[in-house]
Amino acid sequence: EGGFAKTLSWLGNNALAYYGPQTLTGTTTTSTGILTGSYTDPATKLTVPFSGAVLQKQGLAGGNFLVNNQAGYLLIEPGTTFGYPGSEAAGPLLRVALPEAAASAPATSVVALTPLAAGSYGGLLTHGGDITGGLESVVISKTGALSGTVVIAGKRYGFKGTLGVDGAATVVIVRTGLPNITGMIQLALADGTTDGYQLTGSFAADGTVHAVDAAFYPIYPKTAPAPQAGQYTLAMRAPDVVDPATQPGGDGYASLKVSVTGDCTGTLTLADGTTATFGGRVSRKAEWTLHRSLYGSTGGYVAGKLTFRDVPSVSDLDGTLRWLKPNAVPATKSYVAGFDTTRGVVGSRYIPPLAGQRAFSTLANRFDNSWLRLSGPDMSTQPALNLLTMDRATTWTSANTLLYYGPDKITLTFTSTTGLLTGTCVDATRGVNLSFGGALLQKQGLVTGRYLAGAQTGLMMMQAR
């Protein structure tokens, strides 16, 4: 004994359509009202043929099916309220959680010049709490010779100088037709460390004083590798309330690798689709600074500081990034008026799955175990629809392939080596043609990212169903 009930669509051409992991097909001969079809379950390899007739006066179709030389009853009845995977409300839209409090900056003390401070440095410039520039490729020799590049308002300036015995240096950058830039740099040491050297001080340019915050790139030997070594996925979280017409909605995302020597590599995809590569090294105080120029030579950038630390159930590194896009960037199609936003960032250690192991480990071992959720700007080219949200039940298999069964065309590709996901959604009848991407944060048990609809972006995420 047994049976099943499935929700299907009786199409305008009188064919039966079913959206699910099983295969159900059927056709109706319009001249006679006779229907035939079959149902196949790939899990059991069972195929059940069926046939019947349309009873127009009763408003249903009835017939029989045959399996293992036994017959059963077939009933197809009309309705628009039958349930199916994904027809229920998806519930609250989950968002990436941020730590309740920012990491504390390490205490430092001014120190005299020492050969132990020789090496490479990198860091940021700040003014009034905002990140305003960066320090790149800074090198100090054992004798105190100092060189590097300072980035202010998107402009890059090389500088040279010499640290005195007190660990201080004054550098002057001469600009043609513009006032000089003056830098006051001081060597410091993070309290409780033997090689956690820092550079403090300031650069004064065009009436603004920018504070210096740079760190020494320590040497991690093979016998004592960087404790942060490993793979991570990151999310750059959009505010809860953001107008996607004025600045990108959705979360930026990234894959990050920290080598045993503490070097950081990877690629960040910002919410507008712009990409930036990672660089730099984790400091002795587990801090990592990032400064990357964006949008050519327009002065755009993404910059900030992240701290590696364990925040239970939230993150393994966190901080903020300032993201600046100037007005009227050439050849840009989205957010042409520019924007200036500072967003929280969290990262999770990423453990690539073994064969047969689901990377999204909190999902149930069944079909339709996850939600794909989109929320933000209108996803349709048909203004009357005003399609601002979309929820679809999806299947994340133990082979880390992602499946969707439905009338619209949704493709999902997960790269298990990096933890990143990409996809598309096409629904021609409703004028939907989207691309999206995101990252799996294993520590929080969700995928977050962004989708592109026309010239605006919104939030894409996946959560357990």
What does each of the following model-derived ranges do?
Residues 1-465:
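Mature soluble binding/inhibitory domains
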